[in-house]
A protein has these predicted regions:
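Active-site catalytic loop in hydrolytic enzyme cores
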Residues: 113-207, 220-230, 291-302
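CN hydrolase (nitrilase-like) catalytic-core segments centered on the catalytic cysteine
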Residues: 84-105, 186, 191-281
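Beta-strand-turn-beta hairpins that frame and shape the catalytic cleft
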Residues: 1-8, 13-15, 179-188
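Short glycine/proline- and charge-enriched loop/turn segments
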Residues: 25-26, 72-80, 149-153
Length: 310
């Protein structure tokens, strides 16, 4: 498949009965399954819309089954973590992938069955509904900007050991930066904060990625200023397509605005958004063009000087 129609979601928490005050979040402790179900149903409709529009791969947003809860510390949200292979989110996404013959990259809140640890994880599901593997967020942020604070380290830790079973569908020598041989191409994933670390895109490209999906929940002036620049630079340097998906709008009760601006970019610039839906972006990616000579005359892999690498 040379030209791949790809889509990503750009949305926010779909559960309508959120409290108006942060102090009242505790009232949701018995509604966590309802929150997940509302977001699964919302994203199912977006997946169906994208598939009907011809998308063959659909990337969902970071922690898509829930509001972005890491704006504060509240252990209540720990109960949303689920098994990456058998939990309700992956189960429903696998069924949708098989039914609509699409690849789905589904970022969830994972509880590891082996270690009982919690992680921020993207599950990669092929178009037959099978789970090819997962990517676990490698870099976990905490900090404050001019708009608010975030502390993801309270909710999950970084990937720090091999976690995919050996498979000819999982490519690359670095087990923390897997690339997946899907039915539509070689797909890599980086999650939000990972995009700021140069070795992530480089490692995924070196492992053969043709498309890197980068789901995020991001806000703040610097993040917004760098959002497009980082992806454009990485796509040009590493000769890959990149899809950056951000939340859009606000989520009660935190009311932190997310700037959206989700888009696809390739080695030669931004890709046209073909979507007619405000919560989706979609583009046709010419994967075959990645093997053609760069029109700029660049050949960074050939001309790299290994003598100055650390």
């Amino acid at each position: 498949m040379s030209t791949l129609r790809a889509a990503m979601t750009q949305t926010a928490n779909a559960y309508e009965a959120m409290p108006a005050r942060i102090e009242d979040l505790h009232t949701l402790s018995e509604q966590l399954d309802d929150i997940r179900a509302a977001n699964l149903d919302h994203h199912a409709q977006l997946i169906i819309h994208a598939a009907n529009a011809g998308a063959r791969i659909i990337g969902l947003g970071e922690l898509f089954p829930a509001p972005y809860f890491a704006l504060g510390r509240d252990a209540m949200w720990h109960a949303l973590a689920e098994d990456a292979c058998t939990g309700p989110s992956t189960t429903q996404m696998c069924a949708l992938a098989a039914r609509h013959r699409v690849v789905i990259v589904a970022p969830i809140y994972e509880r590891c069955g082996r270690t009982n640890g919690r992680l921020n994880t993207a599950v990669v599901i092929d178009a037959d509904g099978s789970v090819l593997g997962k990517f676990r967020k490698a870099h976990i942020p905490r900090g404050t900007n001019e708009q608010g604070s975030f502390d993801e380290s309270f909710y999950y830790g970084p990937a720090n050991e091999s976690y995919n079973a050996p498979s000819d569908k999982v490519l690359g020598l670095n087990p923390l930066l897997p690339v997946f041989q899907t039915s539509v191409g070689r797909i890599g994933v980086s999650i939000c904060y990972d995009r700021h670390f140069p070795h992530v895109a480089e490692g995924l490209a070196h492992a053969g990625a043709q498309l890197i999906l980068s789901p995020a929940v991001t806000f703040g002036a610097k993040s917004q200023r760098m959002w497009e620049i980082e992806f454009e630079c990485d796509a040009a340097r590493h000769n890959v397509f990149i899809g950056g998906s951000n939340r859009m709008g606000v989520e009660s009760p935190w009311n932190q605005p997310y700037f959206g601006a989700s888009h696809f970019v390739g080695p030669n610039g931004r890709c046209t958004n073909l979507s007619d839906h405000p919560n989706l972006v979609m583009a046709d990616l010419d994967l075959g063009s990645l093997g053609a000579p760069d029109p700029s005359g660049w050949n960074l892999q050939r001309d790299r000087n290994p003598g100055i690498d650390r």
